[in-house]
């Protein structure tokens, strides 16, 4: 009887420890604020970071319009309720639908060769266009452009990551 109680106690302790390990691991991952799809850190990409809240209450943070397009395609039955994006200059999260968007220009985009930048006000967007080029757009056009660019951008990302792996492998 004593052995049976000891066995139950050991199982209980293992379960409790497993729960704590999972909880702490989850908190560590969530605390990093990394893109759900590519792992890029929010601290480095606040100027393009997007927070997507879906109708079902779930939410995700992604580094760019590119990764937001991936999320929208994968969650076709869970439409977004709110989408916020980082203002290019301040990194402050703003409503993506109300943002002043610029597509293109000479500044390399995040996860894309055709940049898509959001600005909180028109003056900032106009100043950016004067300095870097591009054209004004609304959010719907930005998302359409992201889907149009997806194939080429994915090939570009795969090529860059392969080159980085090769560099790391060299002595």
Question: Where does each model-flagged region fall?
Answer:
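Bacterial N-terminal signal peptides
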Residues: 12-24
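Intrinsically disordered, low-complexity terminal tails/loops enriched in metal-binding residues
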Residues: 24-171
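N-terminal secretory signal peptides that target proteins for export/translocation
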Residues: 1-9
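A short alpha-helix capping/helix-coil boundary motif
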Residues: 3-4, 14, 104-106
């Amino acid at each position: 009887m004593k052995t049976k109680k000891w066995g139950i106690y050991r199982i209980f302790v293992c379960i409790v420890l497993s729960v704590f390990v999972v909880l702490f691991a989850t908190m560590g991952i969530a605390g990093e604020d990394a893109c759900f799809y590519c792992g890029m850190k929010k601290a480095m990409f606040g100027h393009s970071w997007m927070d997507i809240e879906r109708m079902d209450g779930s939410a995700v943070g992604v580094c760019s319009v590119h990764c937001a397009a991936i999320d929208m395609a994968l969650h076709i039955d869970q439409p977004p309720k709110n989408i916020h994006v980082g203002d290019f200059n301040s990194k402050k999260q703003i409503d993506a639908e109300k943002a002043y968007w610029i597509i293109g220009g000479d500044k390399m985009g995040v996860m894309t060769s055709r940049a898509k930048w959001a600005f909180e006000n028109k003056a900032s967007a106009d100043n950016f266009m004067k300095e870097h080029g591009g054209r004004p757009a609304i959010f719907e056009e930005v998302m359409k452009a992201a889907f149009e660019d997806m194939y080429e951008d994915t090939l570009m990302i795969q090529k860059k990551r392969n080159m980085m792996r090769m560099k790391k492998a060299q002595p």
